[in-house]
């Protein structure tokens, strides 16, 4: 699929992704398009693996300046989104790092924390198993 219109770049790409997910969830949109990056794609893969999103697709832009990624939110038969909330934790002005012993439980284990580690982006559960700490990017429930 080729896209003509490029979304605006944002200062904090991770914040932009979570804002788009939250807005799409509230507006009950099915698909969302944003500028692609390796970090965004890694986050989307985690959300798909955990069952929060249906799929994603990397799109080519006509001007070929920036790649785009389009992802599909997952809904139940009653049009209830599988994502109830997203909260960004680490921000450009205040990075939050934790060791694996101090990684938070989101809603007593019902949600996930997305962690950026030296081994890549992963959930808090995987980081605890690997005994790796890192930067807490966001909570998803």
From Swiss-Prot:
GO terms for biological process: translation. Keywords: Ribonucleoprotein, Ribosomal protein, RNA-binding, rRNA-binding. Gene3D superfamilies: 3.30.1370.30, 3.30.1490.10. It comes from the Bacteria. Transmembrane segments: none annotated. One of its GO terms (cellular component) is cytosolic small ribosomal subunit. Signal peptide: none annotated. The keyword Ribosomal protein applies. InterPro entries: Ribosomal_uS8, Ribosomal_uS8_CS, Ribosomal_uS8_sf. One of its GO terms (molecular function) is structural constituent of ribosome. Disulfide bonds: none annotated. Pfam families: Ribosomal_S8 (PF00410). NCBIfam families: PRK00136.1. Belongs to the universal ribosomal protein uS8 family. One of the primary rRNA binding proteins, it binds directly to 16S rRNA central domain where it helps coordinate assembly of the platform of the 30S subunit. Part of the 30S ribosomal subunit. Contacts proteins S5 and S12. This is Small ribosomal subunit protein uS8. It comes from Mycoplasma genitalium (strain ATCC 33530 / DSM 19775 / NCTC 10195 / G37) (Mycoplasmoides genitalium).
